[in-house]
Amino acid sequence: MFPLGQVILPGSVVPLHVFEERYRALVRVCMRSDRRFGTVLISRGAEVGGGDSRTAVGSLLTIERAAELEDGRWYLVASARERIRVAAWLDDDPFPRARIRICPDNDEPDRIDPASWSARLAELDGRIRALVAAEVEWGATRDVLGVLPIPTERSALAATLWELVARLSPTALDAQALLECDDPETRLRLFASAVRERELVNELLRADPDPTDPADPIDPGA
């Protein structure tokens, strides 16, 4: 296990700089076996040194590319494939270890109606693109998004939802809540709520682009 200070969602591709000795050992073990390791969010504490508190749900990553430097550090590119749930934490030896359970998104395919999901995902994609375009106009360092192709096959729709989540770049709290949601329909509704909250924030910013400006005081009676 490689706990991190960020939420890694299924479908993500993550660059990692591995410099701490215990995680160098983890990489060496992975490179000798199936190149897979798990990650969860550090809910309290730091990535370096141990003594952290960790969430129970995370992602299973596969090392796609790896380069070891002369001083023993590693640069990795890893892809997240599936959600995992930690059943029990084991002793660090020397890196964090755990017994985990894979939580595939296709456990309940009947919970996904292809026609309904395709329409809802396409609508959410349009709203997210509008949000990002507005944020870029205000100076955010993000790329303007193109249209995301929405599949019609039931098996691909759950993965497409994760692509939309990544496009929104939600807070760690929102991303973790989505990751912990086992039911895909509930996850879609939760994500739609997160998109709406983001829209409300943007509407407030458009109405008052600089709430600290003394030339634009807030009416205390409002």
Regions found by a protein language model. Name each.
Residues M1-A222:
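N-terminal low-complexity, acidic/polar interaction/targeting segments
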